[in-house]
Amino acid sequence: MENVFDYEDIQLIPAKCIVKSRSECDTSVQFGGRTFKLPVVPANMQTIIDEKLAVSLAENGYFYVMHRFEPETRIDFIKDMKARGLFSSISVGVKDEEYAFIEELTRENLTPEYITIDIAHGHSNAVINMIQHIKKHLPDSFVIAGNVGTPEAVRELENAGADATKVGIGPGKVCITKIKTGFGTGGWQLAALRWCAKAASKPIIADGGIRTHGDIAKSVRFGATMVMIGSLFAGHEESPGATIEKDGKLYKEYFGSASEYQKGEKKNVEGKKMYVEHKGAIMDTLTEMEQDLQSSISYAGGNKLDAIRNVDYVIVKNSIFNGDQY
């Protein structure tokens, strides 16, 4: 690893503008045989996504990944999405009952368009075996596997049959893996993404560490096809987290997938809970993300997302906020 850096250490360098208005810029992305409005997906976490929001995102042309923390609801969810004429995108773990679940889908003739195998340390035989199991029983499902943080892991999961890999170990705002274990991509997530993307032959999802909309453009520059985001999507009207009022202000809870709130027990805890200010409607945030990304594309000197992949950059080592708490 030569240069190690994170999002706030990088500035992208503008190229000559070719559009009259940023509204001419197209932020859409192809992923798994579908076109989505943005290269952005809300994290598959219990306080970020639920069935209702999944329907809304799919209806409006956005990608989503349903979480895996209410496993018994997944079959009905897939049936419901199919009945609505929408794509289904679910998450699975690697425990024995998940193998049985995949076989049950085959028996019921249900093929989710997307299946995300989602565990904290995705470079493992457990994930490789699950990829192969899904590919055997549901060959038409697009399999996303993760999470990983090295080129070796990306290559191995791709070779096992993964259609995309998810990169990021512990950079999230409610993830404390970096503190509890000493491992992960926290603090150098963007460099890890770049390192992994160079090894990849299939799409990569950058997962975690996004704090501003500009970080989406930076992720695209360093090889992400999709960018998974938790904290920026937490706290919306549609977010599943509980709402509380404090000093006349509204907040919503947001917790990590390996937190005790998630697990219902204090065992191998690598996540925490926080309260985020209530942010209004999620579609407004998605619109703002789109507008900001359109601006990014115009600064990149193009009118499509791919223009961002070709710009130069500088490493500024944490100075872009000049010590401001952004």
From Swiss-Prot:
Cellular component GO terms, alphabetical: cytosol; GMP reductase complex
Listed EC numbers: 1.7.1.7
Keyword Oxidoreductase carried by entry: yes
UniProt keyword annotations, A-Z: NADP, Oxidoreductase
Catalytic activity: IMP + NH4(+) + NADP(+) = GMP + NADPH + 2 H(+)
Keyword NADP part of the UniProt annotation: yes
Source species, domain of life: Bacteria
Catalytic residues (positions): 175 (thioimidate intermediate)
Function as written in the Swiss-Prot or TrEMBL entry: Catalyzes the irreversible NADPH-dependent deamination of GMP to IMP. It functions in the conversion of nucleobase, nucleoside and nucleotide derivatives of G to A nucleotides, and in maintaining the intracellular balance of A and G nucleotides.
Family: Belongs to the IMPDH/GMPR family. GuaC type 2 subfamily.
HAMAP family cross-referenced by the UniProt entry: GMP_reduct_type2
Protein name: GMP reductase
